[in-house]
Amino acid sequence: HTVTFVAAPMVHWPEAMVTFDTTDGVLFSADAFGTFGSLDGKLFADEVDFDRDWIDDARRYFCNIVGKYGPFVQHLLKKAASVPITTFCPLHGPVWRKDLKYYIDKHDKWSRYEPEEKGALIVYASMYGNTEKTAQTLATALCERGITKTAVYDVSDTDVSYLIAEAFKYSHIVLASPTYNLNIYPKMYDFLHHLKTLNFQKRTFGIIENGTWAIKSGSLMKEFIEEDLKECLVLSAQVSVNSSPNESN
């Protein structure tokens, strides 16, 4: 066998390299094309229902570990396109020997920060249940209008890695947060901070704020998105809830 070593900096370590077996076309891809999850007796991706059982973990792996370094992944994908690869052997997850284009296309989209699906991710924080009720009401209304690709998460009850992965998946994101000491609710701010550190971009945001007096969370979330997230649009129609949702808001 003849092998070639190719530098793949920041995918995801500075010194990362991949190894290409030119004899059989096997790419030992290190952290590239990896995923969370154990193999459970199946070695190859074509032996499992990857789209059903693995793609969510693959997305979560990429977005949280490599997501910040999209341009470096794009550079590696361009290198990979120039050689006849038959098989991916990543350090984490199953081996790919069929339908490589499917998996390459996923990584191409993730690394360009393009959404996979046109749909809505609703992330809410709620202290007394009122903001949660507002978020669920919105989700119901969206589904009634045919937007069935809608996911709703409590930011206080969901590990941020899952929220990041879902944010990379959907085209539209709604943030619903109460005002907390004239600021964004801490868990919601933490989610926004993670988006920033992972170079998240190219999404449309809607904002719902809640409070009894001196409501500030909406304007602060809008300011954060516009100043710290690239190429993101904040819809002008912002919803402001005074404690609990009603017909007027």
Please provide the spans of the model-predicted regions:
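Active-site-proximal loop/helix segment associated with metal-binding centers of metalloenzymes
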Residues: 12, 32-67, 111-116
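Long, well-ordered mid-to-C-terminal structural blocks that present hydrophobic/aromatic surfaces
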Residues: 118-164
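Catalytic core of the metallo-beta-lactamase
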Residues: 1-47
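Short N-terminal or domain-adjacent regulatory/targeting segments
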Residues: 89-116, 190
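Short hydrophobic segments within beta-strands
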Residues: 29, 91, 123-125, 208
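A general structural motif
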Residues: 100-108, 134, 153-162, 184-191
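Conserved hydrophobic helix-helix packing surfaces used for dimerization/oligomerization
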Residues: 3, 26, 120-122, 205
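FMN-binding flavodoxin-like domain, especially the glycine-rich phosphate-binding loop
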Residues: 39, 50-88, 93-95, 137-151, ...
